[in-house]
Amino acid sequence: MIIKVDSANIQRYHQLCKAEHVFGSRSRSALAAYGTDHDVHKFWILTEDGKDTAALHLNGQVLTVVKSGEIGTDDIVALTKEFEIHEIDSDWDLCEHLHTILGGVTESSYYMEYKGGNICPDFPDIQPADLKDVYSVLQQSHEYYRTHLKFEPWADNLEKLSACGAAKVYQLERDGKPIGTGSIISQDDTHAAIAAVAVIPEYRLKGIGTYITKFLIKEILSMGKTPCLISGYDEVAQLYRKIDFLSYGRWGELYI
């Protein structure tokens, strides 16, 4: 059974989001930013045999499923068809299983969490971002952003997440221009997620991405929280391991 999140059961949703901190904090932060009655962002609790088993967050045609154990998939499949969902983000095992039912294409890499110590250096050249500058950096940095990112909805979402205290966006300038960016994109009570660390091509292979990531780690630790992230590719996970991130499972994305 799928139950709509409202003021009476919102704490149950928060509890389910604790099962995994990257997608969980994303869903919880979206709920804080948009509330329970938004036209585009929808939030549900999946229950089975009277027990809450998963937190669901639908953003347009992207469904995030946060769970801690095995769950049934009938309600998720029905929801996917009802809302014409094109992407499901969750643990790898669920995405792999849904792939056998719904078809499509899957991607996967690691959930990662910071296990290192405090970061000592200061970062005087990293500042709160101008979103137009950040958008330009992202567009230059990777084909994914050129294909999927549209400025107005992207900026509007970040402004809402920032307004409720969930997100912080930063940029790095060198030679009088913005050349890198990174974000704290979502938070829960104990963790904050790093995302969209990017550097324009001519400044790559100089340790700048690592430099930005260390700044974000320091910011999150100063909040009394643990940094976490998802590595986009297994090769990228190797870079994060060099700065004391450890993997704790695999995320999956199913594109239908």
Where are the regions a protein language model picked out?
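Conserved GNAT acetyl-CoA-binding A-motif
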Residues: 82-92, 220-232
